[in-house]
């Protein structure tokens, strides 16, 4: 055989192989490549959506944290105000209680002073009557004595 005939036969076999490959082998390979490219594109799109969803979730979490911090600081401020109010009320109650106790003590002292004065008046009246009786050495009438005591009490 001649080199031209062999070359021609190889060319025919080559083109036959190319035709067979293009007709029967290439379409399933191209279809598989297209499907894989679609899956990769879909995966990339899903990753992009996931990334944007993650960023949105981070923003929302940051907002919720800020809101939570604000609420906590507000609660702390309210608690501090309430504590200050309770302390102020306790001070006012203690002050009014102290004033009440002082007034009661003053009233008790005045009452004891009044009792002491009355007792002293009675003792002075008794002493005056005894002194007058011893000076006069006479018997005094009981009704006159009572009148004298009352008069003396009133004068003292």
UniProtKB/Swiss-Prot annotation:
Pfam families: ATP-synt_B. GO terms for molecular function: proton-transporting ATP synthase activity, rotational mechanism; proton-transporting ATPase activity, rotational mechanism. It is found in: Cell inner membrane. The chain crosses the membrane at residues 7-27. Gene3D superfamilies: F1F0 ATP synthase subunit B, membrane domain (1.20.5.620). Its main location: membrane. Keywords: ATP synthesis, Cell inner membrane, Cell membrane, CF(0), Hydrogen ion transport, Ion transport, Membrane, Transmembrane, Transmembrane helix, Transport. One of its GO terms (cellular component) is proton-transporting ATP synthase complex. It is a single-pass membrane protein. F-type ATPases have 2 components, F(1) - the catalytic core - and F(0) - the membrane proton channel. F(1) has five subunits: alpha(3), beta(3), gamma(1), delta(1), epsilon(1). F(0) has three main subunits: a(1), b(2) and c(10-14). The alpha and beta chains form an alternating ring which encloses part of the gamma chain. F(1) is attached to F(0) by a central stalk formed by the gamma and epsilon chains, while a peripheral stalk is formed by the delta and b chains. Belongs to the ATPase B chain family. NCBIfam families: ATP_synt_b, PRK05759.1-2. F(1)F(0) ATP synthase produces ATP from ADP in the presence of a proton or sodium gradient. F-type ATPases consist of two structural domains, F(1) containing the extramembraneous catalytic core and F(0) containing the membrane proton channel, linked together by a central stalk and a peripheral stalk. During catalysis, ATP synthesis in the catalytic domain of F(1) is coupled via a rotary mechanism of the central stalk subunits to proton translocation. HAMAP family: ATP_synth_b_bprime (MF_01398). This is ATP synthase subunit b. It comes from Neisseria meningitidis serogroup A / serotype 4A (strain DSM 15465 / Z2491). The lineage of its organism: Bacteria, Pseudomonadati, Pseudomonadota, Betaproteobacteria, Neisseriales.
């Amino acid at each position: 055989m001649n080199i031209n005939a062999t070359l021609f036969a190889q060319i025919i076999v080559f083109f036959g192989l190319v035709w067979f490959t293009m007709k029967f082998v290439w379409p399933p390979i191209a279809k598989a490549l297209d499907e894989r490219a679609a899956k990769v594109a879909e995966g990339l799109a899903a990753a992009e959506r996931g990334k944007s969803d993650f960023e949105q979730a981070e923003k929302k979490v940051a907002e919720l944290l800020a809101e939570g911090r604000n609420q906590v600081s507000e609660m702390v401020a309210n608690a501090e105000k309430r504590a200050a109010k309770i302390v102020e009320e306790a001070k006012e109650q203690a002050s009014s209680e102290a004033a009440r106790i002082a007034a009661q003590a003053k009233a008790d002292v005045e009452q004891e002073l009044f009792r002491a004065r009355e007792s002293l008046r009675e003792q002075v009246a008794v002493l005056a009557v005894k002194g007058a009786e011893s000076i006069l050495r006479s018997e005094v009438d009981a009704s006159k004595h009572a009148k004298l005591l009352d008069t003396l009490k009133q004068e003292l």
